[in-house]
Amino acid sequence: MINFVMASRLTRRDFLKLAGAAAVGFGFRDFPPGGDPANNRPPSFNIGRTVYSLRYYEQPSSSSKELGFYVTDTVVDILEERVGDPEPEHNPIWLRTPDGWLHSSYVQPVQNQLNEPVMKIPAGGMLAEVTVPYSQSWLINDRGWKRGYKYYYASTHWVMRTFVGSTGIIWYSILDDRGGETYVVEAEHLRPIGAAEITPISPDGVNKWIQVDLGKQRLIAFEANRPVFTTRIATGYFEGDTPLGEYRVERKQPSRHMASDSIGNEFDLPGVPWVCYIAWTGVSLHGTYWHHNYGTPQSHGCINMTPEAAKWIYRWTEPFVPVDDDYVESETGTRVVVI
C-alpha cells in the first residue's frame, strides 16, 4: 500500500504510475506525500460494516461455495485482505471474516472508538465526527422518543448542546441542516473536530488545481504542474451526470444532509462529510459512507471519495473554512477540471 511518497522527486508520469500500481488495501488508500502526517495518515481498519445484505463465500470468489449472508449494517471483523476474482476489474479485493470471504465494494471500513463527551458546547455549535460503526439517533417530541436516522462512521454533524438523560446517558443534540429538526445521539459516539485538525494544507501553494478523470475514475491535485495528491473516485453512473468542463470550488460545507425525492433517484444521506461544491446544480466533491466501490461510476453525479481523501481535499482547496463555520462561498475557489 502506498501511503506517503515524496512527490518532489517524482515526475507526473512516475506519480500516475505509482498511483495506479498502489498495492491493494481495504480502501485502496492513496494519500498525499510528506507534510502533516499526524493529521493525514489513514487509520488502520480491522472491522467493517456491511452497507447492504451481502453474501460470504468459502473462497475469495463468487464462484466458490456460498456459506451465508450478512444483513445490512452487520459489523464484521476483518482478518485478511486478498486479491480474489479478477472481476470486477476495478476492485478485486476480498475480505476474510470469521465466517468466510466477503467482497469489499460494499463494506465500509470502520472503527469503534468511544469519546469523552464535551459538556459545554461553544455558541454556534461544534463540528463532530461519528467514530463508531453507526449510532442510532432519536427525534424527541411531545409523544416521546421516535427513532431517527442512523449516523454512520465518518459522517459529520453539528452538535448544538449536551444534556444528561434520565438514565444517566449523555446525549448530543444534532441540528439537521436539511429539515431543521433536532435529533439526539449518544455523545460518546461522536468525536469533536478541533481547529488544528482542519487547518489549511499548503495555504501558500501556487496555482492549485484539480483534475477529475472520468475515464480513469481518479482525482489528482496539482500545485502548478506538480501532482501532490491522488485518490480513486466514483463519479456519476450515467453519462453526463458528472458534467465535463472547467469549474471552481464555489461553496464548502464540512457537513451536509444530501437528499433527493426524485422518482428513481431517491437518496437520503445525513452528515455527508467534507463537501466542496463545484456547481450550483449540486455537483460536489465529498466523502462517502454508503459504499466503498471506488474506481467505477457509482454516484448520482457527485465525485465520491473516501472520507479521509475528502477531508484532505477540503483542507487543501480554497476557500478555506474556519472550524466554527458551516458554510463558505467564493467566486475564486480552486479550479477543478473534469475530463
Language-model features, listed with the residues they occupy:
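Solvent-exposed coil/turn segments that connect beta secondary-structure elements
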Residues: 81, 100-102, 177-179, 190, ...
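Boundary regions of SH3-family modules and the immediately adjacent low-complexity/disordered segments
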Residues: 35-40, 95-129, 175-205
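SH3-family beta-barrel domains
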Residues: 20-26, 32-59, 69-72, 110-145, ...
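Exported/periplasmic cell-wall-interacting domains
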Residues: 203-205, 229, 238-246, 251, ...
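SH3/SH3-like beta-barrel superfamily modules
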Residues: 70-109, 152-188
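Solvent-exposed, polar/charged alpha-helical surfaces in well-ordered, non-transmembrane soluble domains
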Residues: 68-71, 95, 217, 308-315
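N-terminal secretory signal peptides
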Residues: 1-14, 21-24, 35-36
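Cell wall/extracellular polymer interaction/catalysis modules
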Residues: 162-243
